[in-house]
Amino acid sequence: MSKVQEKYQISPIFVFFLIHGAQFGAGVLGFARIIAKAAGYDGWMGVVITGLCIHLLIWMMYFLLKETNGNLIDLQRQMFGKWIGNIFNIIFAAYFLIVSISVIRTYVEIIQVWMFPTASTFMLTLFLCLVSYYIISSGFRVITGICVISIGGTLGYLFLSLFVLKYSHWDNLLPIFTHSFSDILKSAQLSIYSMTGFEIYLMVYPFVKKPMQSHKYAQLGALFSNLLYLFSTLLAFSFFSEKQLLKTIWAQLSMTQVIQLPFIERLEYIAISGYALVIISSFILPLWASMRATHEIFRVKQRGILIAFFFITLIVSQLLTNRHDINNFISNAAKVSFWLIYVYIPILFIIVWVKRKWKKSKAQAN
């Protein structure tokens, strides 16, 4: 069992910030275009469907963790045994690392496209790795503190969005239901990876005091993030025509260009720099989860694992040289996310639920 000393644990209310910090990141800047490809401006319904699925999955996760009284590593070892369980654990550790790399590389690309076109991918990635090393090596409570601070970046994002509202044309959303239900489901599937991150709680559970009391805060954190994604989608749909949106990679950043302030010429510079608060929390959490999982599987020092992961991040970032490579990497990560989170977790839930019912009926028979 994963036992954590109380001095390293956090209060249940902070789970709100952890879920939001992991879930709301770089994906929101461009996912409106992605879902519009599948269902046009009915794509917002796909966001609602994904949001509802997330709340259901969080409930399943709490059920699983309560039955195990440990984290994901303990759960899979109990269900499948040490060897097979560790195979699944390694898969999840790799998945969390992939998520972290995808967020880092996406943010580096945004900096290069919008701010410094000649900036070195290696140097920008190295800087982000050094920042994350300092935060993660300081402990989980510091990571939680960063997630709390990142709310400031989210509020800044909302503040800028209010300036864009006066340029919105809400009749763009009409008529609704112009696409088939299968198209809407496709848009829901395409929004999954951008809205993922809540699964981080599978590793966080032992670090929370009275973890079952944090369930409502986890649901509220997910609700806050889901509403932000829905708001961002509707805002992008109302601001751009459908043809314009399909040609705009980072819709949310493009919208800031219409905001005019007398003392700032390039507001997107401020927006991207400020949004770093949000981005940092969305890549240090999966990186920490991957490090923690690897530590519990192989029983090696966490600092050594973290340094090794930074080398992997630097190498992979260098290999992703253009938008096509980055997009393929993220698309493949999204497929892995779908199968691990939206397929595997419900299957695991069913197995544990059936096992629990069987044990209960067996006990009553005796």
What function would you assign to each model-found segment?
Residues K37, T106-Q112, L128-S150, F207-K210, ...:
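Membrane-water interface regions at transmembrane-helix termini and the short interhelical loops
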Residues V28-T121:
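Membrane helical hairpin/interfacial module
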